[in-house]
Curated annotation (Swiss-Prot):
PROSITE patterns: MPN, UPF0758. It comes from Legionella pneumophila (strain Corby). Residues 102-225 form the MPN domain. Keywords: Hydrolase, Metal-binding, Metalloprotease, Protease, Zinc. The keyword Metal-binding applies. Zn(2+) binds at residues 173, 175, 186. Gene3D superfamilies: Cytidine Deaminase, domain 2 (3.40.140.10). NCBIfam families: PRK00024.1, radc. Belongs to the UPF0758 family. It comes from the Bacteria. This is UPF0758 protein LPC_1989. GO terms for biological process: proteolysis. GO terms for molecular function: metal ion binding; metallopeptidase activity. InterPro entries: MPN, RadC_JAB, RuvA_2-like, UPF0758, UPF0758_CS, UPF0758_N.
Amino acid sequence: MMVAHTAQQLDLREKLLTNGVHSLSDIELLAVFISSGNNKKSCLQLAYELTKHLGNLRNILNADLQSFKSIHGLGEVRYAQLQAAKEICHRSDFIDLQKEIQLSNTQQTYAFLKKRLRDYKNETFAALFLDSQHRIIAYEELFSGTINTATVYPRPIVERVLQLNAAALILAHNHPSGLSDASQQDFAITERIRDALDLVDARLLDHIVIGDNEVYSIFAENKWVCN
């Protein structure tokens, strides 16, 4: 049985190397990642069971350890590798964003923030810190809360602005509900942070709310915030 499983693995790798990674199905990609099966299941069978259990690649990437381990033959090592691969992709996206001499590509910024934040199960508050030319200094996730709220304090944000010598920043947070509409609390904290940044001559450029499929720009939709 193991000989047959090994042949399957080699066939998949050969297909990838010959025809390119885009020629593989989602299950085949997972099988290449899983790499090896066990005495009872091939890597392809494990990939099929994982997909059947969790539904799609996005769900698999965002699954918790217990859900991942519920497939017999998959454990902590593969889960850790999967999370590492996911983070590598995130950091690669950030490198692409940093290549912008100035942060003028709004859609690219939205796409980056959406990819980083939308799959978190708890509300997470983040910031892009920028220099005076609106070049990116850092991306940091600053506060994390429950499924429907995160307590946000302006003071640590201002302190981080001073530490990084940032001249401007873009705030973002996710709504685990999937809805991107801003709440009254979102408007209130935006104004508090904007006022706090004014005291240190830093500018708040926007506050983005991340839903499942959409983003909401508080500044674009509510010009009063910019005044």
